[in-house]
Each structure stands twice: as C-alpha cells, then as structure tokens.
Amino acid sequence: MGCKGIEDVAMNGRLKKEIEENGFGKMTEVQLKCIPEVLKGKDVVVQSPTGTGKTMAFLAPILSCIYDGKGRGRPGVTAVVITPTRELALQIREVAGLFDVKCECFIGGMSIEEDYKRMKEEFSIAVGTPGRLLEIVGKETKKFSSLSHLVLDEADKLLGFGFEEKLMQLLAKLPRNRVTGLFSATRNDSVDKLSRVFLRNPVSINVGNNEMPVALEYIVVSPMEKLLVLMDIVTGRRCIVFFATCSEVDFFSGLVSRAGFGNICKIHGKISQDERNRVYEEFFQRDGLLFCTDVAARGIDFRGVDLVVHFDVPKEYSSIVHRSGRTARNGSKGESVLFVMPNERAYVEFLKLKGIPAVESSYRMKSSLSYQDIKSMISPELLGLSVKAFVSYIRSYKEHFVSYILDYKGLDFDSLAELFFLERIPGMAELRNVKFEKFTKPARDGKKRALPKKKYRKKRAIK
C-alpha cells in the first residue's frame, strides 16, 4: 500500500506538524484518498482493510476544521464519532487526546450522572456508543446544534450489533447540514442503505483488493485437538484467541493458565467496563495471550500481535476480517488461523464465496500433552466453569447464523465433551436426540448421573 508524507495533504500547518510529531506523518492510502475529500466538505463511504489507518483518516479533517477556527470557540460540539464498542471509543479518544483539542467519551457501563456533568463543560469532539450518545444528545440537543462532522466507525457492525434502532434515533436528532463519513472494513446492503438515507452524494472510497489484512489459514481438527493445537502454536507468541461465548473465555483462560502459560488476559461483554479497561492496558503493555469474544475484534490497536486464532467459527463471516485485523496492523507481519472441525469443512467454501480465501495449513499435530495430562489440572472451580462453557457453546452453535452450513448432527459430541473435560453430560433440550459413545446422558427424570462409560475411564492419550 503506497504512502506519502503529510506534507502532500492540504490542511492546517500547525496540525501537520503535530501529526508528524505524533508519529502519523507517513500517510496511508486510505488517509490520502479520504482526507482531501472530507476537507472539501464531501460525505464519504470508506471501505478499507482493518489496520490501515482509518482512525486518522476521519480524525485529521475534524482536527483541521477545529485548528482552522471553524470549530474552536464556537458553542457546542464540532464532531461526533459513533462506534460499536466501548473499547474502540476509548481508543479514539486516546488518539484525539494527542492533539490540542478536548474530546469526551460517552459509553455504557459508566455513570450517566457523571456524563451529564461533563456535558456542562466545553469540548469539541464527542465519541461513544449509540445507546449512551442517544441519551446524551436527547438531554442536551442544543449542545449539538452546531455539529459539522459525523463519523460512523465500523459502520457494518453498528448495524449488526442490534444498534440499528438507536442509531436511527440518534442520527435523526443530529443536524442534517454536516459532513458525514461511514468507515468500515466490510461493506454490505445495510451500510449502502444507511448511506442513501443519511449521506449526500457520498464519495465512495475502496482501498485494497482484498478485505483480509493477512492470509487466512485453517486447520482441520477434532474438538479436543483444538485445545492441544492451541497450546502448541501460541507458545512464546503474542496472540489473541477468539471464542464464541463469554463462558468459554472464562473456562479456557483459566485452564490454559493452569497449564503454565503466563500472562493470560481475558475480555468479554459480561466483564465490567473498569475491568475491561484494566485488562486492555495490561495486554497493551505486556506480551502474552488475550482470550476474548468479538468485543475485542473491532478497531482496537494492539501493537505487536503476531497471531490471531479463531478457536470457534464466528457467527458472522465478516468477523473473520475484523478479528484478523488485530494482527498485521499498519504494515507489520502477522498470521490468522481458523480451527475447523470435520463437520465444518463447508464453512471454508462459504468463506471463499464471500471473498475471504482460506488455505489449509501445513501444520501437523506435535503436542506432547494428553487428555489425562490436562484433565489432571482441572480444579473444582474450573469444572463448574466447564459445564457453563459447554452449555453456552452448544446453544451458540445451534443458533449460528449459518447453521445450514455447519452440520450440527455431524459434531463429534464425545470429543466435544472431552474438550470441556465434563464429568457428566448436562441435561439440555439441544442434546435430546444426540447419542454419546463415551458418556451416558442423564435420565429424563434428572436422577441418573451421567458419567463417562466404564471402558473409557482408563487413561487415554490424544493421538
């Protein structure tokens, strides 16, 4: 991707100097294509691979407007940036904080009373999530009456996370006479519909022929082998591992930690915002592993991540792109690996049809650990987490967006039970017609304890 210096862009001179001093002087392709159009007052719809510098592509024109005096000194807010996740909002505020502007962040999980107090202060940029911004704008509409710039970052996810109704209400409350930008790594019908309704003759900017920031490799493994391969390939690397559910993150982070892997961080939507902020800061500063759900898949810039592992097939195929974008950022190297169980092979072809090519990895299993080796590490606390993780995974799998492609009946349920190191199979409607060879299920009256069948209780190694 070609780059030029900031000196090639016509914008405020003092801002150029500060951009250079803050390490953004070498402009990326998306910045060079986007910034001039926004400075001319044009709306833009930008599709660019994740990790290519979209944040500065929309912040630079906003900052230039403020530095030129068009936003500074005028009453109210100059720009609003809407994001799908709290962490992305906090990161954008952090980048804006490098410059001579005041930027406030309004996100869920924080005190609304404190937000109302901050609204009484003067600031130029408001960044936040749709729900909290809707509350703020609804109470202080006048403060946003002079708005000149609006940005929807990760626009496809703003529509896909269930924010659509709140987003539409929020946009309806903001002034129409503004410059609007939609930014995302993927573009779908919902984004196009949104642009037709709220943008005026937008300039379409598409950077990069391939949405994927790195080549996607896949490894065909049984459920239990997923854990063994994970423990093998993450050794000594700075890695992010994505799971389907919060309970899986809790269980596997605890298990891998007991297996001797140091500095394991975990993030998911059920963790408090203060704790999420602390964990992000810890992982940002230290090497190690981050186990998470898709809450960490969008926009967050973790430098030096050289491997992304998709432990579970994501519900939305576009998540592959955004997850993979946590590595190979801004030209650095990285890898993205998808674990595919035998019943999920059709998913690889589905990805190819969606423009996300995947190649089978040459990796060969070489783990020295066995099922019994890892099982011996299971504590009573972890055993409790394992049942919750198993139940959440089964339900998530049955409700998968492409369940018609994933062969639920073809799942190796015995290996899946081993992956979660179950002592008994929990009673679940989703397992009513499932037969286990190595485990017995509870009787319908719930009185029968389901333990591994006798012939499988002996020590066994995973081949």
From Swiss-Prot:
Residues 446-463 have a biased composition (Basic residues). Residues 35-205 form the Helicase ATP-binding domain. ATP binds at residues 48-55. It comes from the Eukaryota. Keywords: ATP-binding, Helicase, Hydrolase, Nucleotide-binding, Nucleus, Ribosome biogenesis, RNA-binding, rRNA processing. InterPro entries: DEAD/DEAH_box_helicase_dom, Helicase_ATP-bd, Helicase_C-like, P-loop_NTPase, RNA-helicase_DEAD-box_CS, SPB4-like_CTE. PANTHER family: RNA HELICASE. This is ATP-dependent rRNA helicase SPB4. The lineage of its organism: Eukaryota, Fungi, Fungi incertae sedis, Microsporidia, Unikaryonidae.
